Every structure is written in C-alpha cells, then in structure tokens.
Amino acid sequence: MKNRIKQYLLAASMCVGLTACSDFFEPIPGVQFGLDETFASKQRTEEYLNNVYSYVREVTDAIHPNTYGGIFTEATLDGANRWNKTYAEWTNGSFNSASAQASEYFSKYYQAIAKASTFIQNVDKCTEAAASTRGKWKSEARALRAYYYFELLRLYGPIPLIGEDPIPLDASLEELIKERNSVDECVNFIATELQSAIDSGDLLQRAGKANLGRMDVATCMALKAKLYLYWASPLFNGNTDQASVKNKDGKQLFPQTEDHSKWTQARDAYERFMTFATGQGYKLTEVY
C-alpha cells in the first residue's frame, strides 16, 4: 500500500513538473509585443529604433577574435590596430570562410537591415509621436540601413540588395537565395538612400551632445563621400583581378574598365561635406 501511495505521489509530482515546464515557455504577459502593439506606443517605437542602432560597431570590438573582427578594405585609412587579433589570424593563415569574423558581420548586418526596413514601414503607425518626430526617426533608420549596406560592401564587395520589404519569416528557400548586385548598383543604392535622408529635412544638421551617436546630416554626407572614395579606388574601379566574380547568369559584378569620373564625384562629395561640416563647427585635426 505504501509503495502504491509512493507511486501515486511520484506520478502527481511529474505531472506538476510537466505543467510547470509548459507554463515556463509560455509568453510572459506584458513583455512580448507584436508589431501593432510595438508601434502603437511612442516609447516602444523609440526602443525599436534604438535596437536598430545597436548593430553599429566600433573598432575596439576587434579586440576579441570571436567578435566581428576588423579586416576592412580601407587599410590606408584605419590601418592595423595592435589589439586586432584578426590581423594576426589573417597573416598566419588561420583566417578562412568559416571564421566567425567572416560570417558574423554578414548575418548581423542583414538582421539590422531587416529591422530598419520593418521600422521604416511601420513607424507612421505611431500616432503617439508627432509627425516631425516620426519623420526624424524614419530618416535615421534609412541612414542606418544605408550604413549597414556600406559596411557589407566594404567587407564583402558586391552584395545582395534586399529592397524596401524585409524578407518574411516564413519565406521559402528560393525567396531567401538572392543574387548579388553589382558594385555600381550597390553604390548607387546606398548613395541614393543617404541623399534621401539628407534631403528629407527631418534629420538634425549636427546631432550634438544631447543626441550623440544619432544619424545626422553631417554623418550622412561624410559617409556618402567615403562611399564614393571606395567606388573610385582601384579596388572597385576597373579591378581586372575580380573579372571572374560573376553571378550564375554571367552578370559582371566588378566594373572592368576604370571610370575616372568617379574620382571627380568623390572629390566633389568631400568638398560638399567639408564645406557643410565647417559651417557646423567641425574642423580638421591639427597635428603639430
């Protein structure tokens, strides 16, 4: 009899445990929100935008070999940092396509791009925020999306451009596989997005201390100038070493003929940026 009671108690305790496990994985009320609930609230909408910002990296992240790394194409601008272990892996031959530094940027930046696109599509639902605030947020998200594409371009060269609509979570494998766009297509898209943010009239001219780190007109102009400098460089402008880089349909991804006018566009973009930035109180670093 005692054994029978023990069996009943054991069975009951197991049922309680299973029920507890089931409850454990259920959504916590008031914590998880769908898109409609998120963009119905001004606070949650701003938090969503802050999450889009969270993918912006700084160069010191390269101190850990398991973070995104720092193998950039602008060696003459940034140079190698003494703390950057990625450069050591590159020179000793241990860096390859399976390295975290090669894959992390790709997945993380496309996550950021998808979130930025979702924000752009939904921010106007937030009627709690003033129209001017929504416009500013939307332009910030657009500039951020352009920045993430720029980072992908300088790391991987020609990349797929997803477009305005984020890929649905239930997308088929065929929908997920995207052909790469050419270098010129990538540059033109990024430049157009940055100019759209600049021309919107919604961004701050200069973020200032109160909005430090937010996208502003000065940042967009600087990024566009830097983008054009890459575009004009031999790496992307008539690089015959990349002649074999094509899509399956034979589409050439790297321009094979040097276009000298790209240098003119880069120069003009930098002149516009420096003129604007000087008027906003920026100045070149003085080295004595």
What are these regions (language model features)?
Residues E46-T60, H64, N81-Y156, E174-L212:
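Conserved, well-structured interaction surfaces
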Residues I63-G79, I162-D165, D202-T219, L235-Y288:
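Short, surface-exposed recognition loops and adjoining beta-strand edges that mediate ligand/DNA contacts
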Residues A171-E185, E258-K262, R267:
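Structural transition elements
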Residues M221-L227:
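TPR/Sel1-like alpha-solenoid repeat signature
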Residues C21-G70, K246, V287-Y288:
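Membrane-proximal, proline-rich intrinsically disordered regions
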Residues M1-G30:
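Bacterial Sec-dependent N-terminal signal peptides
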